Amino acid sequence: MKNAAFASLRTISVSSKGFMKQTDSQQYIQTLRLRLLDMSRVSQRAVDYSIKAYKLDSPEFCANVRDSTYEVNILHREITEIARDLLLMELPLESDARFALSAVLICDALHSAHAQAVKIAANSACLLEHGGMPGWEGLTRMGEEVNCMMRLCIIAVFDEKIAHAQTVLGNRGVERLFESVFYDWYSNVDQRLRARASHELAITKGLSQIAKETYEIADAVVFWMKGPDSGSTPHIDGEQPRIHAVPAREVEGVTHSPDGMQAFLDEIDACFADPSFCKTA
């Protein structure tokens, strides 16, 4: 898919030679990068808040997720338009063309992830209205795992490094394991609680979709960094994911075992708290 898209991209670029000044392209690229970082930050925060809305039974977090919808929609439109304009230019570097295409793919995935976060928050609000319920204990764990992958994707976009994206791709399919365990629980729920349990079903589906969007983002980062022949981690339908809850993983030389989930999340939190992380060149 990416090879075909990249070939089409190059055809557009060559056929539009001289359409815009090359000096404009770097300004467009810088603007596109800033907008993409803004959308990454806002979308990740929405996903984080939606998961906390369920975990903490917090109506405030539910409202905070909805409040960012307008901003995300504006950023999605702006990124799409800027990337389109870039693809009509004669870009001097092939890497610039890859970035423009990857920005569109990342932007679309972030937009979809945000939409799922809004749905998760809405279903969490419904659970609060019903006074809560004895829910599936694995849902909080699933939320932490998905949130972790989302954060790794955002770090990959900010740092423009491939290692975090490859870590996410190494987890591809983990959401199916959570879904399988959830459906076993859901099928045995007392019929009197089924209506309320349906909200947790919707939350589980939303988290699964966000996980799939993280794979799209990670694939796009790999394509951006390495090109159309990068051979990013393929998904084989018949392959069983290696992880049940949280995989052992190595990020920048630090190995995290399944028992080290909280330490791993704390490390990512520290990265987000570092003032230099949010600086843009």
State the predicted function of each range:
Residues 12-281:
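Cytosolic, long alpha-helical scaffolding segments
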Residues 4-7, 14:
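Short hydrophobic alpha-helical segments enriched in small aliphatic residues
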